[in-house]
Amino acid sequence: MNKPNPNKQTVELNRTSLYWGLLLIFVLAVLFSSYIFN
């Protein structure tokens, strides 16, 4: 029986949450800059 590696799963989960965090920061930065410059 070949079980998936839980460590690999954790790394993928961390990478996904990291990408979501970067996307959230990027969106907030765009909204903040448009709020400042208008």
From Swiss-Prot:
Membrane topology: Single-pass membrane protein
Biological process annotations from GO: photosynthesis
The protein's name: Photosystem II reaction center protein L
Function: One of the components of the core complex of photosystem II (PSII). PSII is a light-driven water:plastoquinone oxidoreductase that uses light energy to abstract electrons from H(2)O, generating O(2) and a proton gradient subsequently used for ATP formation. It consists of a core antenna complex that captures photons, and an electron transfer chain that converts photonic excitation into a charge separation. This subunit is found at the monomer-monomer interface and is required for correct PSII assembly and/or dimerization.
Metal-binding recorded as keyword: no
Record localization: Plastid, Chloroplast thylakoid membrane
Quaternary context: PSII is composed of 1 copy each of membrane proteins PsbA, PsbB, PsbC, PsbD, PsbE, PsbF, PsbH, PsbI, PsbJ, PsbK, PsbL, PsbM, PsbT, PsbX, PsbY, PsbZ, Psb30/Ycf12, at least 3 peripheral proteins of the oxygen-evolving complex and a large number of cofactors. It forms dimeric complexes.
Transmembrane annotation, as ranges: 17-37
